[in-house]
Amino acid sequence: MKKKNSGKKLNVLLTIKKIGINGEGIGYYKKKITFVKGALPDEVIVCEIIEETPKYIIGKLVKVKESSPYRVEVKKEYAESGAYGLAHVSYEKQLEYKRNILLDAFDKYYKLPKPDKLVLKTLASPMIEHYRNKNQFPLAVRNGRVIAGLYKEGSNDLVEINEDVALHENGNKITNLAKKCLGKYKVEISTNKKTYGVKYISTRTSFYNGDVQLTFVANTDKIKNLDKVVNEIKREAIVKSIVLNVTNDNDHLVMGSENITLYGSDYIVEKIGDTKYELSAKSFFQLNPGATKKLYDKVVEFADLRETNIVLDAFCGVGTIGQYVSRKCHEVYGVDIVEDAIKDANNNVKLNNLTNCIYVAGDANKIVPRWKKKGINFDVAIVDPPRTGLGHLAKNLLDVDAKKIVYVSCNPSTLARDLKVLTRKYKIRRIQPIDMFPGTAAVEAVVELIKK
């Protein structure tokens, strides 16, 4: 049973031993594992115990008595929001910690043979600031001003952010202009389910040409004076698309199913390597285009495709990876549960003049066996699942019997669990961590598996 520390404050001295999977410092108080956000390995700290369970303690950093040489200053708003869990660490050390986070996940969920040899050094992001192509900021009204930012960790208090150091400069520019215009024309802002208005601002910027798509997320399609906001913002040459997304407040997702284009195109175009992608307001796309090219190049290297190869692209999304590798193989079969993603994938096939990519909307667990029954024999299976991992598809991949699997992961824990299943039939050749999100504890990985 969890219990909050409701009595007198209990401050304890702690030596931090390592970094946890979410970027928190880990120490031990009375032999019980203690998690302290903002603390670094080898630091001696004072922390307040704020929660204790039979298995672990959560502490709040009060003071650093002996500081790590790798600690750096971090902007207050990022420390408060909790979104950038390693922003207080030098970048070279972040890369080391991220590899360790991956190793710790394997240690917990699946014991790798010779992990130090299999897990390579983390590939750095080409940019460590202004690397993100997209933001999605909730709105509020404070002292008569419309503000946007990130919620303070564990609360509904909005931390105002006027310049997101991770976001493309064009995204910052248009976000600030949108806030100003919403306030200027007194557009209704909704901060709860009882009011109607604009709830979020989202921008997506193409690193290929600098174009910006601005999306207002609202819980109604009838918003007074939004047309005046659009008329002012569209004067900016970099704005190529303005969209209203209508969301259902009862849904846990930020964006709803309905997009209304208020100005310009339904899409902006991004380019990774020689491949272009049309992206709508709802399209899922990697957030760091520079590091994405590194990731996709690593997929190409690990897949080692031949012109005669047939490739399975599971969880294909808008076709990003499959189309990137398509020029090196005979055919690509892509499947994704999201119908809108498959529509975008087929649009991207036309955009890139490709003739060897086939996309189907549906559950991969049903579609892939159907392809197998039709006599389609996959030489290479590329999988890029969500954070929840492969699920039942892990076992179904064993029946696909591809010579090789290339697994792209955004969650070390589910990766380790899935590899425990896949290694019944496949051998792990190498694991490449890649930093897609500098300043955070997130780490992506590409795994090469070959049939035993």
Model-identified regions with their sequence ranges:
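Short, solvent-exposed loop/turn elements at beta->coil junctions and helix N-caps
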Residues: 120-127, 199-204, 432-436
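Terminal RNA-binding accessory module
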Residues: 1-79, 110-113, 366
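Short, aliphatic-rich beta-strand segments
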Residues: 203, 209-219, 276-280
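Rossmann-like S-adenosyl-L-methionine
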Residues: 2-21, 221-452
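Extended interfacial segments that mediate partner engagement and assembly in macromolecular machines
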Residues: 65-73, 80-188, 208
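Internal alpha/beta scaffold segment
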Residues: 158-199, 220-248
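Short, acidic/hydrophobic/Gly-rich beta-strand patch recurrent on exposed beta strands
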Residues: 25-30, 149-153, 215-217, 345
